[in-house]
Amino acid sequence: MLFQGKSIRVVALPEAGVFELVFDREGEAINKLDDRTVNELRQATQALANEPSLRGVLVSSTKDVFIVGADITEFGAKFSLSAPEITAGVAHSNEVFVAFEDLPVPTVVAINGFALGGGLEMAVSASLRVMSTAAQVGVPEVKLGLFPGFGGTVRLSRLAGPALACEWVASGKPQKAAAALAAGVVNAVAEPEQLRQQALDLLARAMRGEVDWQAQQQRKRVPVALPEADLQAAFVTALQAQAEAQVRAPHQPAARMAIEMMHAAARCDRAGALALEAKAFGEVARTQAARAMVQ
């Protein structure tokens, strides 16, 4: 056992140098990314980084879901802080996902059930993802007057492109496996009973150099790879659609704020884009809409 917490453990698998990071929230039916779990992910990632034999990491869940998102019961206290204080807290948490993303080996997530909000944000920090045909992924934060704050807007823009990323963030709708695969958010889909083996097979191929996992990671560290005209067109379309939506819901600014921030972040590297996301999250968390919807 490389690491044992109350929400996460890291165990060695039979193949030398391969470890499994398991989300298994003690005494609960689901996994959530509460403060304890994020802190344990920090410790687990450090343990993996310090392991000299490390060659690859499988990420899985023992629950019927992968991770359903953050623990909204923690939001009240957090959102009573000032916007700069909220931003600082988000930035501190984001260090965990950056550290996991920057492990020097391939990482593959087996998405067995719902991966929502922070659950999807954790998954897209890995190199590669295999998704069960029975699973769904998404970023539903807009339904709480928010938007993703753990790097979701940054990584989705670079994996799926800004148009689809804006659509996912602004709608908050869960997406099935076929849609996630077509969007480029996951790399493969599998029947539930074959998910683990397909994830292990993909990890083995990545470790053998047959899958360029490093290129998959690098694209999330650089600005969005689109010609300027295409980039501008994507955001003009997204902002027009959101302007129409805001006529129907004028007191819910989260989607518009997210798209405007994603537009600015698209030409930034990872660090710059994450900083913009964290700053905007601090601002949206202090809006009347967010305070009303997370109560």
Q: What positions do the PLM features span?
A:
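Amphipathic alpha-helical segments at domain termini/boundaries
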Residues: M1-D24, A29, E121, S125, ...
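Conserved CoA-thioester-binding segment of acyl-CoA-metabolizing enzymes
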Residues: M1-S60, P84, V98
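Hydrophobic, secondary-structure "cap" segments at the distal end of domains
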Residues: T153-A163
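Long amphipathic alpha-helix in the N-terminal Rossmann-like dinucleotide-binding domain
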Residues: A275, K279-R291
